[in-house]
């Protein structure tokens, strides 16, 4: 029988630990605080911002939102970032992506203080991952995949893992993280030939394509562990992943649902990183 790997159970366990840690920080008169930088007024960004603020409020994490014009000059953005980097009460900084085209992505990412880079956007923090150092900040989404597997006692050692994504947000950092856990990893992408023949041989398949229900049962074997990272909207306006969940769920060993899967853990790990930063900087 297929095991459903619910992320909300993992998130709840992490939050229970965070509550205890936040209480200890309060005893030192330290309140974890996140600065959010949003450029423009995209509905998706605003919805995500509200979700983060709500999650922070539940754990008594403070937030400071900087609503910026989409045409903000890079010079002005960097001045604001410098100010936030120097503000002692701010423990974490989150900049919403993608950036407006006139801003240099590497310049923006490099402007975030390393000790406040809670979503691991700074090139030096990413470099640490590729050197095998997972003790600092790591990107929240790849970490969520790892945390779910650990929670359900799925050992990565010796496993063959296929990741269908080659971005610096998910695929590349996740590949380094599973390598550090002694797995063997294959990265696939849109130009990969005969993808099902590759994924079907894997022990674990991680998909982050961004195409609703694209991945069907022929991509898996009966023991496949399926980690669906994407959050898409189907033809009926309902949230779904890359995997055709209803048709696949009884034909694999284990699978994460969408929603209540990887996404719920991703947001919780962002909160954890804020608390981590507050503890390190206290």
Swiss-Prot record:
The keyword NAD does not apply. The keyword NADP applies. NADP(+) binds at residues 165-167, 190, 231. One of its GO terms (cellular component) is cytosol. Keywords: Amino-acid biosynthesis, Histidine biosynthesis, Hydrolase, Methionine biosynthesis, Multifunctional enzyme, NADP, One-carbon metabolism, Oxidoreductase, Purine biosynthesis. GO terms for molecular function: methenyltetrahydrofolate cyclohydrolase activity; methylenetetrahydrofolate dehydrogenase (NADP+) activity. Pathway: One-carbon metabolism; tetrahydrofolate interconversion. Its EC number is 1.5.1.5, 3.5.4.9. GO terms for biological process: L-histidine biosynthetic process; methionine biosynthetic process; purine nucleotide biosynthetic process; tetrahydrofolate interconversion. It catalyses: (6R)-5,10-methylene-5,6,7,8-tetrahydrofolate + NADP(+) = (6R)-5,10-methenyltetrahydrofolate + NADPH; (6R)-5,10-methenyltetrahydrofolate + H2O = (6R)-10-formyltetrahydrofolate + H(+). HAMAP family: THF_DHG_CYH. Homodimer. Belongs to the tetrahydrofolate dehydrogenase/cyclohydrolase family. Catalyzes the oxidation of 5,10-methylenetetrahydrofolate to 5,10-methenyltetrahydrofolate and then the hydrolysis of 5,10-methenyltetrahydrofolate to 10-formyltetrahydrofolate. This is Bifunctional protein FolD.
